[in-house]
Amino acid sequence: MQGARSAAAMAAAAADEEREVRRAVEEKPVVVVGRRGCCMAHVARRLLLGQGANPAVLEVGDDADPAALVDAALQARRRKDGGDKAAAGDGGGGAAVAFPAVFIGGRLVGGLDRLMAMHMAGELVPVLKQAGALWL
């Protein structure tokens, strides 16, 4: 009985995390989703702060499934856009999803590596402006 109860509690916690991520991605221009205490999520946040954006940072438990959380957020975006296919610019591209997951303007950018690549290529600031994350 104890195992069934803890499994139910874990399922409820996972559903709560999915709801929280989905809501944040729908409402905030920039969202970083990472595990609690993740140093790479901290680096992503600092990079975005350095560009003038103020990202919402959601920390999830160690047992959280990155693919499920990202998929929940992307499904909400697809429903909002009125389509079933991945929106153009969603950085998943069928690749494995890992934390931290960075969303800008409701679209999945990818992880820290993709965020850094955008910054180094000069693509990050225009995307942040388009998402309404910068007031410049």
Swiss-Prot record:
Annotated localization: Cytoplasm; Nucleus
Keywords: 2Fe-2S, Cytoplasm, Iron, Iron-sulfur, Metal-binding, Nucleus, Redox-active center
UniProt GO MF annotations: 2 iron, 2 sulfur cluster binding; metal ion binding
Record: residues binding [2Fe-2S] cluster: C38
Main location: cytoplasm
Domain Glutaredoxin: 18-135
Sequence motif Responsive for interaction with TGA factors, residues: 133-136
Entries under InterPro entries matching the protein: GlrX-like_pln_2, Thioredoxin-like_sf
GO cellular component, one term: nucleus
Keyword DNA repair: no
Keyword flag Metal-binding: yes
Assigned protein family: Belongs to the glutaredoxin family. CC-type subfamily.
Its job: May only reduce GSH-thiol disulfides, but not protein disulfides.
UniProt-recorded name of the protein: Monothiol glutaredoxin-S3
Annotated source species: Oryza sativa subsp. japonica (Rice)
